């Protein structure tokens, strides 16, 4: 088992004296109720999560946790830092979130999502957050000759993705449904606040080289590479656009560790022929189908790995 050995600098100490646990539907929460939001350093391997809060200590009554994801929790004070060791099997969880809002520490760990035994609605019980990029004061990428903006295309494409996801049984939460500006912070917050299972950000690309074309997918977490890879190939196949492959990129909206995230670049608005093709409703519907279908395939793959 890997060990957490990174040297962490100590800062002015915050002392915590109370800790509670709470079981919610689909996840559990560990909360330190005293004032303070110290910087967390997180390390995780297959059977343990280690969270170190810089410049903090725990001086309260040691919690007795007899069941749930936090069973076996260890709290240690080391070199001016508070260290939590949570012996949780990665296969028993879907994702996690360390929330430092409201001057408290809340650690949320999601239970592993279960595969649904339904041929027609394999995504029943799943929450997918759809993020139509840009909007409002931010039109996104533009074709040099004008016309439909990327923000408009993102919204149109997202609506088709939503239709297909709902047909497969998923609950869909949109970061925007009209031409309004939504900050990157708020987009991620919508995912976290709704305890999302998947996050899909929809975009269309552009380049100063107007001859560049094709589909691209972006992911941040290593575990999401297969989803991005498969989706890039399938969208390329149904649209006959070049498959430019998946790229790893720690873009802000992809950084949440609560669940799988992928950012779609469906094509290049800067290339004239592809710009026209991106506005074709049939191609939009076909592309949307690959998004929903790949989420369904990815869910099955992750559940099988966890067994």
Where do the protein language model's features map onto the residues?
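Stable alpha-helical elements in mature extracytoplasmic
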Residues: 150-153, 157, 161, 184-187, ...
């Amino acid at each position: 088992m890997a060990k957490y050995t990174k040297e962490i600098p100590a800062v002015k100490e915050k002392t915590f004296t109370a800790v509670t646990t709470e079981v919610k539907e689909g996840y559990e929460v560990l909360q330190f109720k005293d004032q303070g939001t110290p910087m967390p350093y997180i390390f995780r391997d297959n059977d343990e999560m280690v969270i170190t809060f810089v410049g903090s200590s725990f001086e309260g009554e040691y919690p007795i946790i007899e069941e749930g994801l936090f069973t076996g929790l260890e709290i240690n004070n080391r070199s001016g830092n508070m260290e939590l060791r949570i012996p949780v099997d990665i296969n028993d969880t879907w994702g996690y979130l360390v929330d430092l809002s409201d001057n408290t520490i809340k650690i949320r760990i999601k239970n592993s999502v279960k595969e649904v035994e339904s041929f027609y609605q394999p995504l029943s019980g799943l929450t997918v957050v759809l993020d139509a990029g840009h909007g409002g004061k931010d039109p996104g990428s533009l074709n040099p000759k004008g016309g439909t903006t990327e923000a408009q295309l993102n919204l149109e494409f997202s609506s088709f993705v939503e239709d297909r996801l709902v047909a497969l049984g998923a609950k869909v939460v949109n970061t925007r449904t009209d031409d309004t500006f939504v900050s990157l912070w708020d987009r991620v917050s919508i995912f976290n606040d709704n305890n999302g299972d998947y996050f899909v950000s929809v975009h269309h690309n552009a380049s100063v080289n107007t001859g560049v074309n094709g589909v691209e997918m972006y992911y941040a977490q290593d575990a999401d590479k297969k989803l991005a890879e498969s989706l890039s190939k399938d969208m390329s196949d149904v649209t006959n656009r070049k498959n430019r492959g998946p790229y790893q990129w720690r873009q802000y909206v992809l950084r949440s560790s609560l669940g799988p995230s992928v950012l779609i670049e469906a094509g290049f608005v800067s290339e004239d022929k592809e710009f026209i093709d991106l506005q074709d409703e049939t191609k939009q519907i076909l592309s949307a189908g690959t998004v929903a279908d790949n989420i369904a395939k990815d869910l099955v793959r992750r559940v099988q790995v966890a067994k």
